[in-house]
UniProtKB/Swiss-Prot annotation:
GO terms of biological process kind: CENP-A containing chromatin assembly
Quaternary data: Component of centromeric nucleosomes, where DNA is wrapped around a histone octamer core. The octamer contains two molecules each of H2A, H2B, cnp1/CENPA and H4 assembled in one cnp1-H4 heterotetramer and two H2A-H2B heterodimers. Interacts with the inner kinetochore. Component of centromeric nucleosomes. Interacts with mis6. Interacts with sim4.
Protein name: Histone H3-like centromeric protein cnp1
Family statement: Belongs to the histone H3 family.
Function: Histone H3-like nucleosomal protein that is specifically found in centromeric nucleosomes. Replaces conventional H3 in the nucleosome core of centromeric chromatin that serves as an assembly site for the inner kinetochore. Required for recruitment and assembly of kinetochore proteins, mitotic progression and chromosome segregation. May serve as an epigenetic mark that propagates centromere identity through replication and cell division.
Highest taxon in the source lineage: Eukaryota
Any GO CC annotation of this UniProt entry: chromosome, centromeric region
Disulfides per UniProt: none
Classification via PANTHER family: HISTONE H3-LIKE CENTROMERIC PROTEIN A (PTHR45810:SF1), HISTONE H3.2 (PTHR45810)
Organism: Schizosaccharomyces pombe (strain 972 / ATCC 24843) (Fission yeast)
PTM annotation: Ubiquitinated. Is degraded through ubiquitin-mediated proteolysis when not protected by its association to the kinetochore.
Gene: cnp1
Length: 120
């Protein structure tokens, strides 16, 4: 009788294996290593090009000319590479400022200090 109750009956829910839980910070470190190994761009192309076109159209509108700017795809890609390299370097300096202050969390004042030191 006891053996029969242990067997699965029709209609019983299928037991799903539990998802493995990692210690706090393990997945974050894995994600950091993944992005450090990769060389692909992290900002999506379409939103970046939209922002660039919007800023350039505002810039052209200030000079009251009727000429719109056209962008080559290679120019947008080059600009995106430079922007991402700038941001990565800024975050590296910001992290160093936080470490210097004996913290592991970056704060706004770390980024302000990094920009002030770099002259950006």
């Amino acid at each position: 009788m006891a053996k029969k109750s242990l067997m699965a009956e029709p209609g019983d829910p299928i037991p799903r294996p539990r998802k493995k839980r990692y210690r706090p910070g393990t997945t974050a470190l894995r994600e950091i290593r993944k992005y450090q190994r990769s060389t692909d761009l992290l900002i999506q192309r379409l939103p970046f090009s939209r922002i660039v076109r919007e800023i350039s159209s505002e810039f052209v509108a200030n000079f009251s000319t009727d000429v719109g700017l056209r962008w080559q795809s290679t120019a947008l890609q080059c600009l995106q590479e430079a922007a991402e390299a700038f941001l990565v370097h800024l975050f590296e300096d910001t992290n160093l400022c936080a470490i210097h202050a004996k913290r592991v969390t970056i704060m706004q004042r770390d980024m302000q200090l990094a920009r002030r030191i770099r002259g950006a």
